[in-house]
């Protein structure tokens, strides 16, 4: 892979300083919550991956140390250890100057996904301390930094070595990451596993040395993205073996793997130089365009589509498709839309992917004739179902059919008085009794109430036309008013927030999961925008005294309960709420609906693959994966009165005081 490129001191280019990083970290790592925290690790890992991507080294070890710091070690060439043309040691330039990287101007890399150097300096700026150890040219070098990037030592030669590579250890700064500086093994695992899937020869080890959390996992996939697709489809009924294509066009390397399952949603994961492009881009467009064109040509050739028939829509062809599209693009062609590298803008990538897929897919379809015919028939059925769903939507939206909508919502929805969609909230409330209290206790101006009476369908297993037949889901679709599935338009939503409010028991949790499954599958932009919430009613009410001296307090956790019991002393009465219906309207407003005092959990999708796999595991047809997951993640000795707040993985937003970076 272009080994003549010279990764040396002079190949590191300096573009600008580091001043703004600590002041505005969100601009560089997205946020200072746990996503931003883990992003620090990815920046350093991506630098190590770049070495492997360009043919140097094949191992990366990531270790969460006992003191909460983290180490990333590779066996690449090792960072340059000489003096940079600016007069400073090159290592110091890499770790203290923003945009000092080996990728700029093609100095050290043909293809690069990490910002190689940008990442290193940003991580240093946001760390309490950072140390780098380099094995290069037979010597071991060491340099340390502290207090957000200031060198605390020069580059020191420590001894001799036969190895090559770089080891970076850092401890995040808790004055920047105020919520937590604790790394989550599972979050890191998903991302590292992804990197291993994308590079066949890469071996990654993840270690956790923290007391009580000791754990180790290895990731190495000889069949690369073929195994990635199998991993994503785990727990689903698949229709064939994974298909893979590789090729090169316009100097861009293209790898594609795909497999159909029996479900109704598509999952396309795209990558550029091993970095996930979660918002897609030109490479994804090229894949979809070629696939749609080739499938339609094939359908006409085998006479499943007649001359008079219109072409199959891409959405119908991709129903039940899981695909991974990975491209490697030379630096001079690489363009992203926006700062976060989440959407590819390189125009040549579209034609490159289109060319490779259009060249290879027809042969695959001819070779697998029986399967191909069944996939075409599947797409035709999807087209028919989509047409039926479209007609149902049009019926619901057209003026002449408004009576049906009014009938559907009659006696159910209690609307907000305001028409301000930027402020209005929709409460989905379990049961009639709680719905009644919510109607009386709400702020009529901006809060709408929709009680859920019947059974909510499990949308993981249902197709769109069946979902429309479920009264509860249909009512939610009409109430939100922004469409559903591929036709969902978030800007048309009648509400800024959708808040799920259920009892704090097993049935309530089940309703939450059913609703979240629906939102994740069919109104995903609403979840991605952070506009779906779970209301958190209190578990306990404590009351003491009478008349003017009467004091009423609420507790959401056992910890809060114990604190209040000590504070109130003897003589209080304690009520354990079993359901929302036990609260009168004033109590429900005060504890669960008042923006000044309520507690909400914002539902967020941090990792698309992880979220999708969890939904399949928990809501799919197969019992065994669900049983194994539950046994691994839940203690069945839990007391009935334990709260969701006791889960350290749940981030809670209290009193509606959202951080600017969380919104």
UniProtKB/Swiss-Prot annotation:
Mg(2+) 2 binds at residues 503, 505. Residues 386-418 are annotated as: Disordered. It comes from the Bacteria. It catalyses: ATP-dependent breakage, passage and rejoining of double-stranded DNA. Its EC number is 5.6.2.2. One of its GO terms (molecular function) is DNA negative supercoiling activity. The keyword Nucleotide-binding applies. GO terms for cellular component: chromosome. Residues 424-538 form the Toprim domain. Residues 387-398 have a biased composition (Basic and acidic residues). Its cofactor is Mg(2+); Mn(2+); Ca(2+). Binds two Mg(2+) per subunit. The magnesium ions form salt bridges with both the protein and the DNA. Can also accept other divalent metal cations, such as Mn(2+) or Ca(2+). Mg(2+) 1 binds at residues 430, 503. ATP binds at residues 7, 47, 74, 114-120, 341. GO terms for biological process: chromosome segregation; DNA topological change. Signal peptide: none annotated. The record marks 455, 458, 510, 626 as: Interaction with DNA. Keywords: ATP-binding, DNA-binding, Isomerase, Magnesium, Metal-binding, Nucleotide-binding, Topoisomerase. Heterotetramer composed of ParC and ParE. Topoisomerase IV is essential for chromosome segregation. It relaxes supercoiled DNA. Performs the decatenation events required during the replication of a circular DNA molecule. PANTHER family: DNA GYRASE/TOPOISOMERASE SUBUNIT B, DNA TOPOISOMERASE 4 SUBUNIT B. Belongs to the type II topoisomerase family. ParE type 2 subfamily. NCBIfam families: parE_Gpos, PRK05644.1. This is DNA topoisomerase 4 subunit B. It comes from Staphylococcus aureus (strain MRSA252).
